[in-house]
Swiss-Prot record:
Similarity remark: Belongs to the frog skin active peptide (FSAP) family. Dermaseptin subfamily.
Role according to the record: Has antimicrobial activity.
Entry superkingdom: Eukaryota
Protein name per its UniProtKB record: Dermaseptin-J6
Gene Ontology annotations for the cellular component aspect, listed alphabetically: extracellular region
Keyword set, alphabetical order: Amidation, Amphibian defense peptide, Antibiotic, Antimicrobial, Secreted
Tissue expression remark: Expressed by the skin glands.
Subcellular location per the Swiss-Prot or TrEMBL entry: Secreted
Positions carrying Valine amide: 29
GO biological process: defense response to bacterium
Length: 29
């Protein structure tokens, strides 16, 4: 349903944000 779609989108956003944060940290080291 709609709720599971929202949860999936949230998970994807968290993953993308985590990857971006890791990339920024790696770049700054």
């Amino acid at each position: 349903g709609l709720w599971s779609k929202i949860k999936e989108a949230g998970k994807a956003a968290v993953k993308a944000a985590g990857k971006a944060a890791l990339g920024a940290v790696a770049d700054s080291v």
